[in-house]
Swiss-Prot record:
Domain GED: 532-624
Gene: DRP1E
Keyword Cell division recorded: yes
Name of the protein in its database record: Phragmoplastin DRP1E
Organism: Arabidopsis thaliana
UniProt keyword terms in alphabetical order: Acetylation, Cell cycle, Cell division, Cytoplasm, Cytoskeleton, GTP-binding, Hydrolase, Microtubule, Motor protein, Nucleotide-binding
Molecular-function annotations in GO: GTP binding; GTPase activity
Matching InterPro entries: Dynamin, Dynamin_GTPase, Dynamin_GTPase_CS, Dynamin_N, Dynamin_stalk, G_DYNAMIN_dom, GED, GED_dom
């Protein structure tokens, strides 16, 4: 059977560890960790300025230790962890930010709270969500943890931003919104409960009242003839937990430094002898409130432990997976660094080849270049213009010169064919460029998909540069090859193709008297348009044959010179150069993204926190 001390102490230890790591709730964004703090049951003390909130806390502790003054005094959350010690032991306090330093003078505790507040917020009345942790060890307290939050206010004082009221409420809400937060709502009895800032906020976040404890202060300051029974007995505002009345020290008592133990006795006497509240005396006062909260907190902790363990185990799994993805810290040994770089290059190369071979998307775009882009480009070549009747007549005439051809204008044919074949250079080079750009995109995509490389932006840049440099060399070789294919077609025409064409001798054009035209007539006048159309048709047929050939051979050249080489030797030059580098240069390639290094460190710290918390819970024999 677990004890109240062990359960509340367990939560105290986990809370302190959370604060050290910066986990005090309110984490947002895709990179935010699960907040262990928010899963822990807490008691948040909420009240307006001058509600008597500080006096209630001091009554529970039995010590005068909180800063006092006008305006906003509490400007950072104060996590107050109370530890009951054996009777006769000396009281002392410890701050989380001053480990192993014990304060026995509680006036110095007050000063340190003020100084530590100013260290974060400055002295200009600003507020901060970063909590101060204060542990008090005393035989006069119960085991309990309370979070003192800044007092709710409506107006800003000099030196504060105009949004201070909204800022404070927003901070308070980050605590009380959480389902594991117990709300201790402090309201003064000498004001209408309907106007209580604490009750308004509690009702907003806890409309059923199951998480709210109402505390009514300043009962002794109410007008004569009036009392607060309507509230204390739950008739004017009902909560699921009983209201507790408190009588704090008067300002005169505070000025005289009246002992808190004496103040407790006076409070008990007030309720015991009060004609209005005597019947409620056993359930009134700061001592009863402390015991009530301690018992309830222990009960809530016991109930929540299974869900806390579930969150911890889930978070441990997620963090371990993330750390695996990010990889271990980089080795400092040059040999190990070189091995790490080569392993990552091999991982990249594997992914790159998978894109080309169909294991991943992207390689099909190269086929699209050959099956769609190249044929479309070949169809768009201006052969119709080149082989128009006017163009054929002009080229044949220029090829004949001063001696017209006798039967077939061979020189004209050759000029027409060579001119037409020159157009194939454009689609050939465009195919090479298109394949090059696909390969470059696959390099970029493969680098981004290589998990191991994500840690090292410098290596990513150098690897991309090396791969693209190799692709550029492959492109140049490929262009030479495809241009060579076109030039080969121009260099030697297939005469057999023309021998198989139907042969028709064109008869010279005769004059009206059935006489042959004069030899001195222009060449173009010797043959009819049909002769030149037949030449254009023959040349077109030959060009189409060459086009079909190039449509098959250009892809072969691109694949052989670019795709095949990219698979075989994309990083060969990089490998030869990287092995010559010294340790410092290798280390520069393995400089990680600072954000990633920070994330790994945070993950490792958070993982340590969760594992420690799990061990702490396992060490407590709590009853399920």
């Amino acid at each position: 059977m677990t004890t109240m001390e062990s359960l509340i102490g367990l939560v105290n230890r986990i809370q302190r560890a959370c604060t050290v790591l910066g986990d005090y709730g309110g984490g947002t964004g895709s990179n935010a960790f699960n907040s262990l703090w928010e899963a822990l049951p807490t008691v948040a003390v909420v009240g307006g300025q001058s509600s008597g909130k500080s006096s209630v806390l001091e009554s529970i502790v039995g010590r005068d230790f909180l800063p006092r003054g006008s305006g906003i005094v509490t400007r950072r959350p104060l996590v107050l962890q109370l530890h009951k010690t054996d009777d006769g032991t000396e009281e002392y306090a410890e701050f989380l930010h001053l480990p192993k330093k014990q304060f026995t003078d509680f006036a110095l505790v007050r000063r340190e709270i003020q100084d530590e507040t100013d260290r974060i917020t400055g002295k200009n009345k600003q507020i901060s969500p970063v909590p101060i942790h204060l542990s008090i060890y005393s035989p006069n307290v119960v085991n309990l943890t309370l979070i003192d939050l800044p007092g709710l206010t409506k107006v800003a004082v000099e030196g504060q931003p105009e949004t201070i009221a909204e800022d404070i409420e927003s901070m308070v809400r980050t605590y009380v919104d959480k389902p594991n937060c117990i709300i201790l709502a402090i309201s003064p009895a000498n004001q209408d409960i309907a106007t209580s800032d604490a009750i308004k906020l509690a009702k907003d976040v806890d409309p059923t009242g199951e998480r709210t404890f109402g505390v009514l202060t300043k009962l002794d300051l109410m007008d004569k003839g009036t009392n607060a029974l309507e509230v204390l007995e739950g008739r004017s505002y009902r909560l699921q937990h009983p209201w507790v009345g408190i009588v704090n020290r008067s300002q005169a008592d505070i000025n005289k430094n009246v002992d808190m133990m004496l103040a407790r006795r006076k409070e008990r006497e007030y309720f015991d002898t009060s004609p209005d509240y005597g019947h409620l005396a056993s359930k009134m006062g700061s001592e009863y409130l402390a015991k009530l909260l301690s018992k309830h907190l222990e009960s809530v902790i016991r109930t929540r432990i299974p869900s806390i363990l579930s969150l911890i185990n889930k978070s441990i799994e997620e963090l371990e997976r993330e750390l695996d993805r990010m990889g271990r810290p980089v080795a400092v040994d040059a040999g190990a660094q070189l091995y790490t770089i080569l392993e990552m290059c091999r991982a990249f190369d594997k992914i790159f080849k998978e894109h080309l071979d169909g294991g991943r998307p992207g390689g099909d775009r190269i086929y699209g270049v050959f099956d769609n882009q190249l044929p479309a480009a070949l169809k768009k070549l201006p052969f119709d213009r080149h082989l128009s009747l006017q163009s054929v007549k002009k080229i044949v005439s220029e090829a004949d010169g001063y001696q017209p051809h006798l039967i077939a204008p061979e020189q004209g044919y050759r000029r027409l064919i060579e001119g037409a074949l020159g157009y194939f250079r454009g689609p050939a080079e465009a195919s090479v460029d298109a394949v090059h750009y696909v390969l470059k995109e696959l390099v970029r995509k493969s680098i981004s998909e290589t998990e191991e490389l994500k840690r090292f932006p410098s290596l990513q840049v150098e690897l991309a540069a090396a791969a693209n440099s190799s692709l550029e060399k492959f492109r140049e070789e490929s262009k030479k090859s495809v241009i060579r294919l076109v030039d080969m077609e121009s260099a030697y025409l297939t005469a057999e193709f023309f021998r198989k064409l139907p042969q028709e001798i064109e008869r010279p054009v005769t004059n009206s008297k059935n006489q042959t035209a004069s030899p001195s007539s222009a060449t173009l006048d010797q043959y009819g348009d049909g002769h030149f159309r037949r030449i254009a048709s023959n040349v077109s047929a030959y060009v189409n044959m060459v086009s079909d050939t190039l449509r098959n051979t250009i892809p072969k050249a691109c694949v052989y010179c670019q795709v095949r080489q990219a698979k075989l030797a994309l990083l060969n030059y990089f490998y030869s150069q990287i092995s010559k580098r010294e340790g410092k240069q290798l280390g520069q390639l393995l400089d990680e993204d600072p954000a990633l290094m920070d994330r790994r460190l945070e993950c490792a710290k958070r993982l340590e926190l969760y594992k420690k918390a799990r061990d702490e819970i396992d060490a407590v024999a709590w009853v399920r």
